[in-house]
Amino acid sequence: MEDFVRQCFNPMIVELAEKTMKEYGENPKIETNKFAAICTHMEVCFMYSDFHFINERGESIIVEPGDSNALLKHRFEIIEGRDRNMAWTVVNSICNTTGVGKPRFLPDLYDYKEDRFIEIGVTRREIHIYYLEKANKIKSEETHIHIFSFTGEEMATKADYTLDEESRARIKTRLFTIRQEMASRGLWDSFVSPREARRQLKKDLRSQGQCEGLPTKVSHQTSPVLITLEPMWMDSSRMATLRASFPKCLEK
C-alpha cells in the first residue's frame, strides 16, 4: 500500500500526510491504510475547491487552467490541513465577517457563495450510514455535509450538492480510479476491512521478521487530517501544482 500511495498521489500531498502521521506518533510504513485515506481526503478537498471562483458580480464561475484569475476570489476557503490554531482563527474570522454560526468541530471548507461551512467525507463503507454518523457528530445546521464513496455514490445535506455535475464527476472518477488501481494490486479488500488489513499487515511484517511486539488489536483512532499544511498552499496559487497533474499510477 505504501508503494501505491507514493506512486498515485501528488508528492506534496504524500509529504504532508507523512508529517501529520508522524506528529501523532503514527508510522506511514505501518499504518498504510490510514496513510492512503489521509492522502485521498486531502486530494478530494483540493479538487472540491479547484477551478471555482467568484466574479465581481458575486457569481460563481469556473476558470480553466491557463485562464486569468488574478482579479477573482476563490469560492472556497480551505480550512482542512491548516495548523489547528490557525484553522480556528480563520473560522472565527469568517464567522465574525459573515455572521454565520461557529461550528463545534473544524470543517474542511467554507463556501463564500452559499455562506456555509462544508464537511467533506470520503467513505469506504455504506454511504448512508457514514452520512448519519457525520450528521450525528456535527449536530449543526450551519455545516453542510457532502459525502463521496469509492463506488461513485454521493450524499449531501438536503440533496444540495453545491458543485456542478462535471466538477463532482471529476472527484468521483478520481475515487473510482483509486479503487480500481488498489483492486488491481490486491489492496482494496484490506483497505475496506480492518480485519483483513490486520491480517495482511501481520503477514507482511512476519515475512520481514518485524512481527514481534505488534499490538493485537487494530487502532480505530482517527488522526486529525493534514493539520501541518504549509502556508504556501493557502495563497492565490495554492492549486497550481495540483491542476490537471494527478500522477498516473505506475505498475510495480
Curated annotation (Swiss-Prot):
Site features described as Important for efficient shutoff activity and nuclear localization, chain residue numbers: 195, 198-199
User: Keywords, A to Z?
Assistant: Decay of host mRNAs by virus, Eukaryotic host gene expression shutoff by virus, Host cytoplasm, Host gene expression shutoff by virus, Host mRNA suppression by virus, Host nucleus, Host-virus interaction
Q: Where is this site: Important for efficient shutoff activity?
A: 202-203
What are the recorded Gene Ontology BP terms?
A: viral RNA genome replication; viral translational frameshifting
Q: Which domain of life is it from?
A: Viruses
Major subcellular site: host cell
Active-site residues per Swiss-Prot or TrEMBL entry: 80, 108
Q: Which GO terms describe its molecular function?
A: RNA binding
* Database matches in InterPro entries: PA/PA-X, PA/PA-X_sf
ATP-binding listed as a keyword? no
List the subcellular locations.
Answer: Host cytoplasm; Host nucleus
Q: Which family does it belong to?
A: Belongs to the influenza viruses PA-X family.
The record's domain comment reads: The probable endonuclease active site in the N-terminus and the basic amino acid cluster in the C-terminus are important for the shutoff activity. The C-terminus acts as a nuclear localization signal. The C-terminus is recruited to host protein complexes involved in nuclear Pol II RNA processing.
Known role: Plays a major role in the shutoff of the host protein expression by cleaving mRNAs probably via an endonuclease activity. This host shutoff allows the virus to escape from the host antiviral response. Hijacks host RNA splicing machinery to selectively target host RNAs containing introns for destruction. This may explain the preferential degradation of RNAs that have undergone co- or post-transcriptional processing.
UniProt name for this protein: Protein PA-X
Write down the species: Influenza A virus (strain A/Swine/Wisconsin/1/1967 H1N1)
